[in-house]
């Protein structure tokens, strides 16, 4: 999914890296070394990022949610998403005796990454999702047993907005 939703970034990186790689064959001396270094400066961080992402998202147990186990089942679960909800359906199925309240703070004017727009087309939001503002959550104080914000809070880029969000939680 990372490549699928961020393909533009990887395409530009591949083109840039390939450009410097192939140009380096027509050069000599310091210019050849510089082109090779530029190629590596693009390829190594992007390749490392992809390998780390593969390990975290695909090879690890992160998406099997074995780490999300409760000795006492929560009565009310709030699941927070930011335009891309991969977990509400799993939570609803796994904790069917709990009441799930999925909320989504995605705001197209604030959260402008094209990858989220692409993800929303592939993964529709949970049908019970409540659209909210990250600064004004419609939850009563102490009304939930568990809040899950799995891979969503990092989408709040503004520091003040992030602080306000955590205060709301």
Residue ranges of predicted features:
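Membrane-proximal soluble helical/coiled-coil segments
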Residues: 63-169
């Amino acid at each position: 999914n990372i490549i699928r939703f961020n393909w533009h970034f990887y395409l530009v990186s591949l083109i840039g890296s390939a450009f410097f790689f192939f140009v380096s064959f027509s050069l000599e001396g310091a210019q050849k070394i510089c082109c090779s270094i530029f190629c590596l400066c693009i390829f190594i961080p992007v390749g490392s990022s992809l390998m780390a992402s593969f390990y975290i998202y695909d090879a690890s147990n992160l998406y099997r949610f074995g780490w999300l186990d409760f000795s006492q089942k929560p009565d009310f679960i709030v699941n927070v998403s930011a335009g891309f909800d991969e977990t509400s359906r799993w939570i609803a199925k796994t904790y069917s005796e709990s009441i799930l309240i999925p909320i989504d703070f995605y705001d197209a004017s604030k959260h402008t990454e094209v990858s989220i727009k692409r993800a929303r087309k592939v993964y529709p939001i949970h049908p019970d999702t409540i659209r909210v503002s990250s600064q004004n959550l419609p939850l009563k104080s102490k009304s939930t047993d568990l809040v899950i914000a799995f891979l969503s809070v990092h989408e709040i880029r503004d520091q003040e907005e992030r602080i306000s969000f955590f205060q709301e939680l």
